Amino acid sequence: MSETNSLLQEKPMPDSHFSLMERGAATIILTGIILLVGAIVGHDVAPGNILSESYDTYFIEPHSIDSTTGDAGYNPVDTVSYSLLLVSFVVVISAWLRRIGVPPRDESILALMPWIVWASLGEVNEDGLLFDPNGMGGLFVSPLIHFHVAVWVILIGWMSHNVDKKSGFDGRTKVTQLAVILLLLQWVIFMPQIGQHWEQDILEWVQSPLFLSPFAGLLLIVLIHPFLECCTAIEQGLIQAGIGGCFVHLDGWLMLYIEPLNNREPISMLPFLFIVGVPFVICAVLWVTGQEARAQLKHMGLEACIVPEGITVEDWERQNSSTWERLESLSPIAVLGSPVVLLGMYGQMVDGLATSVGLENYGYGEKHVASQWVIDVAGTAWGFGALKFGLAAMIWWLFAYARFEYRHRHLRLLVLLCLLVVGLAPGLRDVLRMTLDV
């Protein structure tokens, strides 16, 4: 007993306390907000000042061009700024979720998957000029699309929680009813702009994706209700409302594929199936490979890459117990059985294939500064694809050999969500727009 205690030299920080890293991330976000307000106010108080001019040049103009005339591309200033803010938000939000006691469930990340697809479909509809470039279209241009999605997610999560809490025994049924209402709300908001591009009588409209796709989403929301009992009310609401919203945006994509606008010529579905299918097969094989090791850790009450409660990472590295040996030996394989880790890897592979195929075979251009540099160095877009597959392997390596303290379980999930936002979301957008030739 004395030997074991000698290995535990530090007590983990309480969940209610913020670490230096978390306070530093909050400072970066606060600084960004102050600079943003200063740039906006500076237009009126001191026209022509360097802060306001830089804000217009590096942030506003690219966004305006992107929403009105097409891909404007990023620049080094906004690339660094967005990256720094993204990492800071990941750290701060994970700390906030830990402090208020939200359970760090893998299912929470899976519940956000429909919203990643929702954002990708919305961006493609914006690329196809279905939304007003000077109005709603701006909401589907990066980086504003991320805040747009966040508003939907936060509001739906809040409403789902409150509906369930106030409804008693039939709260879950009320959450499904809420999801139906939210689907209809999205239909009312987005359908007028999507549907105005095709002239149809009522019979043609009922037989077209403009009606059939949202109706299919409505049916699916109702049909999956019994299978969501294992989820929290927030997760259920996000899944159902997100799926419904995906079908609302899917109607625009389907119409552009069936009845193209502006002399576009959609391609066959083979590139789409190749880009989304090959990574899926790889991840399916990896998932099967990791199941036995993951089950062994679960039987012991352990989770891959998570240090047991009450131990710091520093103390864990000094351990030599049977628990330490089992976790360290099984984690590299068990990680492969984690759906959320595989989703992060899948997103990187899809993004790599979509970019490579789109640039090499269909004449698209790369808008990200770092990605274009990789392509220039490699001499081919397939070099970027190879790098993305390498990043997928690095994601496995990170979660196989890095160790997260028990209090940092939220951070682990937010890191995976961040990887989905910068990997799967743009990858899906690229392959969906490539299929439409937009």
Task: Give a label for each model feature.
Residues 2-438:
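Charge-biased, low-complexity intrinsically disordered regions
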